[in-house]
Amino acid sequence: IPLAERIRPTSLDELLGQEHLVGNGSILRKAIENGKIPSMIFWGPPGTGKTSIANIIANSLKVPFFQLSAISAGVKDVREIIELAKTKPGAILFIDEIHRFNKGQQDALLGAVEKGIITLIGATTENPSFEVNSALLSRCQVYVLKSLNEEQLIKLLQSAIDKDEILKTKKIKL
């Protein structure tokens, strides 16, 4: 199992950075606490918590969670998940690298998002205004994630060293 998966946070309180989105009283934290989240797109650099936040949302809301990578998925995969989601109220579809989907692939999501069959969470490192088609973008809220600062990175590394079973066996000093 890759280190990123072994140390992935499981709650908003474990997540480092992104206080503007998930800190106490923030808009996204309130939505999660109220159990009502909109379809959304997380935009930010690699390693800022886009996938982690999506997983935390699904775990917090205890709803079915489907995950696709736009690098390898196609319209058929999207349609299969939408069909499954019709029998699973509140289902979340997380699409990593959503900017890699072409217009047709993005259009396949429209009806299901509009009807509330799925709640879409997309993740992208590219500006969604240019990479996500306007019809889909208009049905989503865009949240911008910021790079972690040096203090947060050190805290993350120290936490990994302290908690990870493999790293615990090494003599690592920061």
Question: Where would I find each of the regions flagged by the language model?
Answer:
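Walker A/P-loop
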Residues: 1, 30-68, 82-86, 110-115
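A short, basic N-terminal segment
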Residues: 1-34
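Conserved RecA-like P-loop NTPase ATPase core
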Residues: 15, 42, 51, 58, ...
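Short glycine-rich substrate-engagement loop in P-loop NTPases that contacts/grips substrate
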Residues: 21-26, 63-95, 102-103
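Conserved catalytic/switch belt of AAA+ P-loop NTPases
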Residues: 32, 95, 104-138
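A short hydrophobic beta-strand->loop->alpha-helix junction that borders the nucleotide-binding pocket
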Residues: 44, 66-74, 124-125, 145
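Conserved AAA+ ATPase "SRH/arginine-finger" region at the nucleotide-binding site
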Residues: 69, 141-154, 173
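Short conserved motifs of the RecA-like P-loop NTPase core
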Residues: 168-174
